[in-house]
């Protein structure tokens, strides 16, 4: 059985087969998840049985490369371990079914799952048994079943090419890193670029030399109304203030309170509504506005897509498919949004009928992420959602509705003030028509200036010079890293969350104040990959490869050709790395105390979950200890031990007693060593929204709290 979907000549290699069926029963529908199966079965009725494959049923073997390089990069698939009972059950159900429909997700991975199911169940590729829908609603599902299609082998080839390329890179470079650096390391097409971006930014920060500069801000009065203006220049030319001497020269030219209004420039400015969400823009906004990690965003979005029970409405899918780089909105959804906006705010707020241009490279079989039913407002369904589901749904709903509204219009005014050739500029703006801002909060606020005319006089109230220093570029957050990867054409919607997870799991980077900081190990690995595999971390090279893979999806290129084009030069780089890469010894840091088992010095080692203490006499002595941080508070449970800061395997901080397991005290919040004056329970320090901390009672039923601390 050939494992590629097509030969080089693009002729389908799978022969048509005839299946003998027993007495026809129900129509069998196979989806990925049980939650999705439950929703769809209710929509389709008694003549359909919907079952779940629970993700992929076949994959490449984990213990080997599983790609036959000598035979056109043929992937060597096996049934996933532990899925034999499920596969047997699917075969039995398919044999008894009247017809079999494959309704996995509407993307490359979903198409590949359907292709593997067709192979396992011996379904002809010519058969129209593939059903796709972008939202799990009754109408969308029923309409999709009216138009089943063949499995899209181009889409499968694109997925298979990516899978093979990832194997070739990961399973070729990783063993070299194991030999030269340490076990458990990995490299990958997207993760190595993400790591390089983080390391490069850290190098920029370390090399940054702050430069001094100054500003002069003034407060002025027109009658009783005050407004602000900032120094711009001298004698009609912009004049930067680099030193205190520059400031003194300006201040010496100021004489008295009167400033002349030289110029008043009024304009009308339009600000268009934001586009509806793609996967990456949703991830960025969820990180910035909701403080969600990327993985959490995708997990909650999956729940909203697969559906929740909404009282009398029953089980409903709440959003469209959440892995997309399209900003397209269907005409039906546009019409529904128009009706909602016109009803709630008036016709003048709706931009019904306007077309949206997609970003270059967007896979436009999908829509943008939007609510399945715009009339399911966040307030209307809030009681059926948990707090995280409601937060993300509200974000998606607001963004979609705003995207279908007209631009906001601002009146802006720019006023030039001068005295003795010293020029200050005041800028003001006022919302003339709120447009999409009616529903979508924006950071810009109106800054009203008093009405002024040219050649009149205003009074200076005070002028304040202030020293500043230029700041280094900020470290990447999850949101800014995803944005940079997307802007460079690296990766696709489905790759961002697992990429960020992998570079943290390998301890190449750590999150410090929600920003990525490279570890020593990450810097070592990055240096080696940059030196020996420059194309892997070249964003232009990787973006070009993504375009080639998109052409495979469009049927314009053969996947084997694209893989071969990459692998031949890559194989030479592998040979050079095997010969030229020197072995690197990561030195253990002395811990400063001796082993309590054998007396040898303890050292600090780097493991999968971070640093830990270990005996230097390993393997003769295997004594290890967790690195703990005392917070200076006695245990509120046993009153004998000390509270220490610890981390879960997922790197979440919690607090526990150092007498564990004799004392099992734990708390997610930091105890402060005082008891609540109302309930007597111990007090804890909680982080509060908007930054800062607050001391509250650890007893949820007690409302005691102290003032917020910044």
Curated annotation (Swiss-Prot):
Residues 152-574 form the Topo IA-type catalytic domain. Residues 1-22 are annotated as: Disordered. It is an enzyme of class 5 (isomerase). Disulfide bonds: none annotated. InterPro entries: Topo_IA, Topo_IA_2, Topo_IA_AS, Topo_IA_cen, Topo_IA_cen_sub1, Topo_IA_cen_sub2, Topo_IA_cen_sub3, Topo_IA_core_domain. Coiled coil: none annotated. Its cofactor is Mg(2+). Belongs to the type IA topoisomerase family. This is DNA topoisomerase 1. It comes from Lactococcus lactis subsp. lactis (strain IL1403) (Streptococcus lactis). The lineage of its organism: Bacteria, Bacillati, Bacillota, Bacilli, Lactobacillales. The gene is topA.
């Amino acid at each position: 059985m050939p494992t590629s979907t097509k030969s080089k000549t693009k002729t389908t290699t799978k022969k048509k087969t005839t299946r003998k069926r027993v007495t026809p029963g129900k129509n069998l529908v196979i989806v990925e998840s049980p939650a999705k199966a439950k929703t769809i079965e209710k929509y389709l009725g008694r003549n359909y049985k919907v079952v779940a494959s629970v993700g992929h049923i076949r994959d490449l073997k984990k213990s080997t490369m599983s790609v036959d390089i000598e035979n056109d990069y043929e992937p060597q698939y096996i049934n996933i371990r532990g899925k034999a009972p499920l596969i047997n059950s699917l075969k039995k159900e398919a044999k008894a079914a009247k017809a079999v429909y494959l309704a996995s997700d509407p993307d490359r991975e979903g198409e590949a799952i359907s292709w593997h199911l067709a192979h396992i169940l011996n379904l002809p590729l010519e058969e129209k048994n593939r059903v796709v829908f972008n939202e799990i609603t009754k109408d969308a599902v029923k309409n999709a079943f009216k138009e089943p299609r063949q499995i899209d082998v181009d889409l499968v080839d694109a997925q298979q090419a990516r899978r093979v390329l990832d194997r070739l890179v990961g399973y070729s470079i990783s063993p070299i890193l194991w030999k030269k650096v340490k076990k458990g390391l990995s490299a990958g097409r997207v993760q190595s670029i993400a790591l390089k971006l983080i390391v490069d930014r850290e190098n920029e920060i370390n090399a940054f030399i702050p430069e001094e500069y100054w500003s002069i801000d003034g407060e002025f009065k027109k009658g009783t109304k005050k407004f602000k203006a900032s120094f711009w220049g001298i004698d009609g030319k912009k004049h930067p203030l680099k030193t205190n001497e520059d400031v003194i020269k300006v201040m010496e030219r100021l004489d008295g309170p009167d400033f002349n209004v030289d110029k008043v420039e009024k304009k009308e400015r339009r600000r268009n509504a934001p586009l509806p969400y793609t996967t990456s823009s949703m991830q960025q906004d969820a990180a910035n506005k909701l403080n969600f990690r990327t993985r959490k965003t995708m997990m909650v979005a999956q729940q909203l897509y697969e559906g929740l029970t909404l009282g009398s409405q029953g089980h409903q899918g709440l959003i469209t498919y959440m892995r997309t780089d399209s900003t397209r909105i269907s005409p039906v959804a546009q019409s529904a949004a128009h009706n909602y906006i016109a009803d709630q705010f008036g016709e003048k707020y709706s931009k019904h009928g306007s077309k949206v241009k997609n970003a270059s490279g967007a896979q436009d079989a999908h829509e943008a992420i939007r609510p399945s039913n715009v009339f399911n407002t966040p307030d209307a369904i809030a009681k059926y959602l948990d707090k995280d589901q409601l937060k993300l749904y509200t974000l998606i709903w607001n963004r979609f509705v705003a995207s279908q509204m007209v631009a906001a219009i601002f009146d802006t005014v720019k006023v030039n003030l001068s005295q003795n050739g010293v020029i200050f500029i005041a800028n003001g703006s006022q919302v003339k028509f709120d447009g999409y801002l009616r529903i979508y909060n924006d950071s810009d606020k109106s800054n009203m200036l008093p009405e002024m005319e040219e050649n009149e006089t205003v009074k200076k109230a005070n002028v304040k010079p202030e020293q500043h220093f230029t700041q280094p570029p900020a470290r990447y957050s999850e949101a800014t890293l995803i944005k940079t990867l997307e802007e460079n054409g690296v990766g696709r919607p489905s790759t961002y969350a697992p990429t960020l997870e992998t570079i943290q799991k390998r301890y190449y980077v750590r999150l410090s104040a929600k920003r990525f900081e490279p570890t020593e190990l990450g810097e070592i690995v990055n240096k080696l990959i940059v030196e020996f595999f420059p194309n892997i971390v070249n964003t232009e090279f990787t973006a070009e490869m993504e375009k080639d893979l998109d052409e495979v999806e469009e049927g314009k290129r053969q996947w084997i050709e694209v893989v071969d084009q990459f692998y031949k030069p890559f194989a030479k780089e592998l040979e050079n790395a095997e010969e030229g890469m020197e072995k690197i010894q990561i030195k253990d840091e002395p811990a400063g105390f001796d082993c309590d088992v054998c007396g040898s010095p303890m050292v600090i080692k780097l493991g999968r979950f971070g640093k830990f203490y270990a005996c230097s006499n390993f393997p003769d002595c295997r004594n290890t200890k967790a690195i703990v941080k005392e917070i200076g508070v006695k245990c509120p449970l046993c009153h004998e031990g000390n509270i220490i800061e610890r981390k879960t395997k997922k790197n979440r901080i919690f607090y526990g007693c150092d007498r564990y397991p004799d004392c099992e005290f734990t708390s997610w919040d930091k105890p402060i060593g005082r008891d609540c004056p109302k309930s007597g329970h111990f007090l804890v320090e909680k982080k509060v929204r908007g930054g800062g901390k607050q001391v509250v009672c650890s007893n949820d039923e007690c409302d005691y709290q102290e003032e917020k601390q910044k």
